[in-house]
């Protein structure tokens, strides 16, 4: 079985390769929790997929793609922490956002994902 770091590396690479939300679902446990810390948490694989699909969509004002650039990654057992720069591609521009992510991996699947970032920075860059 893959180590928790390997699971998270593959997940970040899948985002960077524009993997569709329904395919990203395979990375999560059925009862996973996804929490962009400035927002409310999302529980359950299907709800996570719907959330991802709602903000990765072509055309204005949607986000056409996000590349997860992992700067540093570390694990303590099943908990993996990533220091990232997420590069957002919009129809008319792109921007980068520093992010700290914490993942919990259970039996080779992501059971919790928390991203910490500056919401003011994100909204100002989205326009």
Tell me what each language-model feature is.
Residues 52, 68-73, 85-86, 98-104:
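Hydrophobic/aromatic beta-strand elements that line small-molecule binding cavities or substrate pockets
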